[in-house]
Swiss-Prot record:
Mg(2+) 1 binds at E415, E422. This is Lysine--tRNA ligase. The lineage of its organism: Bacteria, Pseudomonadati, Pseudomonadota, Gammaproteobacteria, Lysobacterales. GO terms for molecular function: ATP binding; lysine-tRNA ligase activity; magnesium ion binding; tRNA binding. Binds 3 Mg(2+) ions per subunit. One of its GO terms (biological process) is lysyl-tRNA aminoacylation. Keywords: Aminoacyl-tRNA synthetase, ATP-binding, Cytoplasm, Ligase, Magnesium, Metal-binding, Nucleotide-binding, Protein biosynthesis. It holds the Pfam family tRNA_anti-codon. PROSITE patterns: AA_TRNA_LIGASE_II (PS50862). Its main location: cytoplasm. The keyword Metal-binding applies. The keyword Protein biosynthesis applies. Belongs to the class-II aminoacyl-tRNA synthetase family. Homodimer.
C-alpha cells in the first residue's frame, strides 16, 4: 500500500468553480477535442516584446506592413470580453503578450473563447499590431484551447498563510509570481556561471556516490536507508569530501562537484535537510590560495549574473568588490569579548567560566576548541556583515583539516561569513594518514560519548591517504545560501523549488 499526500481542503466557492470547469472539460471530451497535442510553437512573448519594443519605429502601420505572422502558446492570465472584440493576455516562460480578438475574424473560436477561463492554456496565430495605449498585441487569426485548467488561479498571493502555500504549491507560485520565477532563473545562471568559471581554470567536474557505506566528510547526522538486495545499511551522503579527495590521490588534481547533500538536522530559514553544495579540491594549493579562489569565484559570479558586485541581503548592503577581511577565530573572539585573554583561548577551565558567564550551554565532553567555537558562534558570528574569512579553527572542530605548523592546536582552515551567515568552508587538507586515523578515532570516541554528528572511522580513506595525497586545498560553498545572497532572499525556502514542509493535515 503506497502512502499518499492528503488532499488539501478546498473552500466551497472554489469547489463550485472547479465543478463548473469540469463540466466544460466534459463538453470538450464530448467533442473529441480535449487536450490536443499537435500545435507547434514558433515564437515567445519575451522575444517579441524585445524585438518590437520601440513604439516610435514599430507603429501599428509598420507592424501590419511587416507582414509578420507569429505562432504562440501560453497560459491565459487575463481576459476582457467586449462584445464583438475582446482582449486577452497570455504568459509563457519568457513573459506576457496581449491578444486582440475579433468575432468576425475568429468565428466559432471567438464564441468558444468567451467560455474559456483564466488559467487555460491556449494557442494563437496571427499578425502584430499596437493598441491605442501603445501595447504590442497579437491580432489573432486563429485561436485554440490546448489545456483546460480545472482549478482557478488565486486572486491574491500574499500574507503569512499564503507564503506557506507558495512553498507547498510552487507550481502555482511560479505561474502568478514573476519575482519567484526570476529567483529560480537567477539560480540557474549562478550555477552555470560557477561551472564556467571552474571549467576555464582546468577543474574537472565529477560525480561521486550519493549513498555511502560510511557517512563522512562533515560533522552531521546522516539519513539512513537499506539496500534490500545486498541486505546492507547505507547512508545518504552528508558531504562528498572523502570521495573527492580519493580522486586527488588518484591524480585528478583539480576536481569539483555541484550536487546534493543530506543532513538529518532541523529546518529553518537557513537550513533544509537536502541542499546543494559546490565542493572542490586543488592539489598544491594552500588554504590561503583557496581563500583567494573563493573570493574571486563569488565576486565574478555576482558580476556575471547581476552585472554588479553590490547586493542587498536581509537589510544589509553588501559590497563584494573589496578584498574580503581575514580574521583569526581567537582574535575575533577576544575582540568581541575583552574579558577573554589570549591565554584563555586554549584554557578549557577558563573558557567554561566564560561560557557560564555568557549563558552559553555546553556539554561536559567539550574541550577548549569546541568551547571557543561556541563562544564565537554566540558572540561574533552575527556581527560579521561584510564578507569576512574567519581562519585558524581549533583542531577539535576541524577533523579533516591540516594542523597549523606554527600554532599548536589550530588548523589551516577558514569559513566565510556574510551578514552573519556562513557561506563557505575550506582548509588545507590533512594528508597525513596517521594523524587522520588518530582524529577519526577521536571522532569515534565522541560518537560513543553521545555526539550524533561525530564522524565514523573510514579505513578505506586512510588506505587511500597511505598511497600519498599531494598537499591539497579544499572548499565547500553552500549554493542555496549563495543564491540567497545574490537574490536578496531571506529564507532558504525562497531559493528551493520544493523545500521540505510538514505534510498537510
Amino acid at each position: 500500500m503506497t502512502e499518499q499526500t492528503p488532499a488539501p481542503q478546498i473552500p466551497a466557492d472554489e469547489n463550485s468553480l472547479i465543478a463548473e470547469r469540469r463540466a466544460k472539460l466534459g463538453a470538450l471530451r464530448g467533442q473529441g477535442i480535449a487536450y490536443p497535442n499537435d500545435f507547434v510553437r514558433e515564437h515567445f512573448a519575451g522575444d517579441l516584446q524585445a524585438e518590437f519594443a520601440d513604439a516610435d519605429t514599430w507603429t501599428p502601420e509598420a507592424l501590419e506592413a511587416s507582414g509578420r505572422t507569429v505562432r504562440m502558446a501560453g497560459r491565459l492570465m487575463a481576459k476582457r470580453v467586449m462584445g464583438k472584440a475582446s482582449f486577452a493576455q497570455i504568459q509563457d516562460e519568457s513573459g506576457r503578450v496581449q491578444l486582440f480578438l475579433q468575432g468576425n475574424v475568429l468565428g466559432d473560436a471567438y464564441t468558444a473563447f468567451k467560455g474559456w477561463d483564466v488559467g487555460d492554456i491556449v494557442a494563437v496565430e496571427g499578425g502584430l499590431t499596437r493598441t491605442k495605449t501603445g501595447e504590442l498585441s497579437v491580432k489573432a487569426g486563429a485561436l485554440r484551447l490546448l489545456t483546460k485548467s480545472l482549478r482557478p488561479l488565486p486572486d491574491k498571493w500574499h500574507g503569512l498563510s499564503d507564503v506557506e502555500q507558495r512553498y507547498r504549491q510552487r507550481y502555482v507560485d511560479l505561474i502568478v509570481t514573476p519575482e519567484a520565477r526570476e529567483v529560480f532563473i537567477k539560480r540557474s545562471k549562478i550555477i552555470r556561471a560557477m561551472r564556467a568559471w571552474l571549467d576555464a581554470r582546468r577543474f574537472l567536474e565529477v560525480e561521486t556516490p550519493m549513498m555511502h557505506y560510511i557517512p563522512g566528510g562533515a560533522t552531521a547526522k546522516p539519513f539512513t536507508t537499506h539496500h534490500n538486495a545486498l541486505d546492507l545499511d547505507l547512508y545518504l551522503r552528508v558531504a562528498p569530501e572523502l570521495y573527492l579527495k580519493r580522486l586527488v590521490v588518484g591524480g585528478l588534481e583539480r576536481v569539483y562537484e555541484i550536487n546534493r547533500n543530506f543532513r538529518n538536522e532541523g529546518v529553518s530559514t537557513r537550513h533544509n535537510p537536502e541542499f546543494t553544495m559546490l565542493e572542490l579540491y586543488e592539489a598544491y594549493a594552500t588554504y590561503h590560495q583557496i581563500m583567494d579562489l573563493t573570493e574571486q569565484v563569488i565576486r565574478d559570479t555576482a558580476q556575471t549574473v547581476l552585472g554588479t558586485t553590490q547586493v542587498s541581503w536581509d537589510g544589509a548592503d553588501i559590497d563584494l568588490a573589496p578584498a574580503f577581511r581575514r580574521w583569526r577565530m581567537d582574535e575575533a573572539v577576544r575582540h568581541h569579548n575583552p574579558e577573554i585573554s589570549a591565554a584563555d583561548c586554549t584554557d578549557r577551565e577558563a573558557l567554561l567560566r566564560h561560557c557560564e558567564r555568557l549563558k552559553i550551554r555546553v556539554k561536559p565532553s567539550y574541550d577548549w576548541g569546541k568551547l571557543l567555537l561556541e563562544i564565537f558562534e554566540a558572540t561574533v558570528e552575527h556581527t560579521l556583515v561584510q564578507p569576512t574569512f574567519i581562519t585558524d579553527h581549533p583542531v577539535e572542530v576541524s577533523p579533516l583539516a591540516r594542523s597549523s605548523d606554527t600554532e599548536p592546536g589550530y588548523t589551516d582552515r577558514f569559513e566565510l561569513f556574510i551578514n552573519g551567515k556562513e557561506l563557505a568552508n575550506g582548509f588545507s587538507e590533512l594528508n597525513d594518514p596517521e594523524d587522520q586515523a588518530a582524529r577519526f578515532q577521536a571522532q569515534v570516541q565522541a560518537k560513543d560519548g553521545g555526539d550524533d554528528e561525530a564522524m565514523h572511522f573510514d579505513a578505506d580513506y586512510i588506505r587511500a591517504l597511505e598511497y600519498g595525497m599531494a598537499p591539497t586545498g579544499g572548499l565547500g560553498i553552500g549554493i542555496d545560501r549563495l543564491v540567497m545572497l545574490l537574490t536578496g532572499s531571506t529564507s532558504i525556502r525562497d531559493v528551493l523549488l520544493f523545500p521540505y514542509m510538514r505534510p498537510e493535515a
